[in-house]
């Protein structure tokens, strides 16, 4: 019985990986994981499904999750990211671990999205148990080194701080309703919408000036002097000092040239509390690297420790890279006696060669033609 037309398709936003694509993804992933290991990060794996009670989204994020029910009626969620599941795991399975703890991962995540695929591969790290700006700088530097390691593209890292945004909003005294709308448009880089929103609220000119300039504040360290002209609020001074220190440490790591300070960055997940960053590559209209500090998350799991980390959208990066061929077999073995073909193929594989054996008798000419179509350069015919 033939499958229906629906049975021949895959759900919207999901994808198959053909050999060339998978080979490229696996090489990039292995390269990133080897780098993470060299920086003392240990790989972990969490379940594809988590209880909804673990993920606990804020209202605006909930619609982006894939949800289902188990047989007991509990809400289950396909993991939309790895930071929260790892926080659950560390707080339960690894309680009492010596901090700081460095963990890394490679996994598929699932989110409804208008801008890109709904299933995508991520590699990333979590640095748990340190509030130092050096920890923030380490994860930014590691993200940069990972992008360099994957190779083949230009990229730009934008670095900001959530405390600067909240400090400025507090200084200006804008209504909470306005702040939520402004924050939403700022996260989407909707500059036209921001200008319209600010004008509609009719703030005094000084407040309007700050609100319209903030989204465009990006550059090098001296840009932070502008922020201090707007406010000397203690929380804002602390955030600016922390961001300065992270930026200076990045020079020590030798990666500062890849980084631009950007005070318009607001991460999409609600748990970010300090330094935040995004990475962009040409041809992709959304960040391929997202990360930052989230010091409040572990407290929700009963383990009150600071943390920072990042995730790289490997799928988005690979789509921008030219697919190289998957590793083709090196030797094609054929012959009239299947037992001898099997024996010869085994012998060659034991030497480390990639071997394809012919399953049917072929003439020499047929074998050459078949190997040529497959891109196999060496042919062994056994009698």
UniProtKB/Swiss-Prot annotation:
Upper taxonomic classification of the species? Bacteria, Bacillati, Bacillota, Clostridia, Eubacteriales
Q: Which UniProt keywords apply?
A: Amino-acid biosynthesis, Cytoplasm, Histidine biosynthesis
Protein name, per record:
ATP phosphoribosyltransferase regulatory subunit
* GO terms under biological process: histidyl-tRNA aminoacylation; L-histidine biosynthetic process
GO MF, one example: catalytic activity, acting on a protein
Q: What's in the GO CC field?
A: cytoplasm
The lineage's top-level taxon is Bacteria
Localization terms from the record:
Cytoplasm
* Entries under InterPro entries matching the protein: aa-tRNA-synth_II (IPR006195), aa-tRNA-synth_II/BPL/LPL (IPR045864), HisRS-like_core (IPR041715), HisRS/HisZ (IPR004516), HisZ (IPR004517)
Q: What does this protein do?
A: Required for the first step of histidine biosynthesis. May allow the feedback regulation of ATP phosphoribosyltransferase activity by histidine.
Q: What is the annotated quaternary arrangement, including any partners?
A: Heteromultimer composed of HisG and HisZ subunits.
The pathway that the record names for this protein is: Amino-acid biosynthesis; L-histidine biosynthesis; L-histidine from 5-phospho-alpha-D-ribose 1-diphosphate: step 1/9
Family in the record: Belongs to the class-II aminoacyl-tRNA synthetase family. HisZ subfamily.
Q: What else is known?
A: This function is generally fulfilled by the C-terminal part of HisG, which is missing in some bacteria such as this one.
